[in-house]
A protein has these predicted regions:
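N-terminal loops that bind phosphate or other acidic moieties
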Residues: 1-207
């Protein structure tokens, strides 16, 4: 990925596209969560992201760094469950790490995501291999540092979500199931992969 200047229109496109992609898969995400969690991941994510869409004009009127922080606050306040604080932390950390010149490349995105992963580890008291969204974000972060293409990163995110299926959950509600959590995709891994795939597709179309 070369240099990318984040404009208000591009930010709006990314936020809207990502929100709509997850909302469209809300029932699937809830079905995944019914197997190993509270059964509300899709419902909660849909509620939070519908609030983001409803406030999109105000959000995208802000500089990108502040816009991401606003998205994060909305996710914390509106999503509920475990996902709200986690996705809120992700968005707010990305906003905190955002470059002052609004110019992005793979290396900078990799640094921003690395900081977000560390923040998520602290917030969720989880690490890699615990069958969470971290198991998608970490390989994506490595792919960014390696300057992989958007198509490659999208495929890596999809594969990483699928790789949570044989894992045993050791964090969150799914961990109560022990070995019975094996054989199911983690809902948070699925939703984060879906977001990354959507962002990659939109950025590829813009390049």
């Amino acid at each position: 990925m070369g240099k990318l200047q984040m404009t208000p229109d591009l930010l709006r496109s990314l936020l809207q596209g990502t929100a709509e992609a997850v909302i469209a898969q809300a029932e699937h995400l809830t079905a995944l969560d019914q197997a190993i969690g509270d059964g509300d991941h899709g419902i909660n994510m849909k509620r939070g992201l519908e609030n983001v869409l409803a406030d999109l004009d105000n959000i995208t009127a802000k500089p990108p760094a502040e816009a991401l922080k606003a998205v994060g606050m909305t996710m914390v306040m509106k999503v509920g469950g475990a996902s709200g604080p986690l996705y809120g932390t992700l968005a707010m950390t990305l906003g905190k790490e955002w470059p002052t010149d609004d110019e992005l490349d793979s290396a900078k995105l990799g640094q921003m995501l690395a900081a977000s992963i560390e923040a998520l580890k602290k917030r969720g008291k989880a690490d890699l291999g615990a069958k969470t969204m971290l198991d998608v974000l970490a390989p994506v972060q490595q792919a960014l540092e390696a300057n992989k293409s958007m198509a490659e990163i999208s495929a890596i995110a999809k594969q990483a979500a699928e790789a949570t299926i044989p894992m045993k959950a050791t964090r969150g509600r799914a961990s109560f199931l022990g070995d019975r959590s094996i054989g199911h995709m983690d809902p948070g891994a699925c939703s984060s992969a879906l977001m990354i795939q959507t962002i990659c597709q939109l950025l590829e179309e813009k390049s």
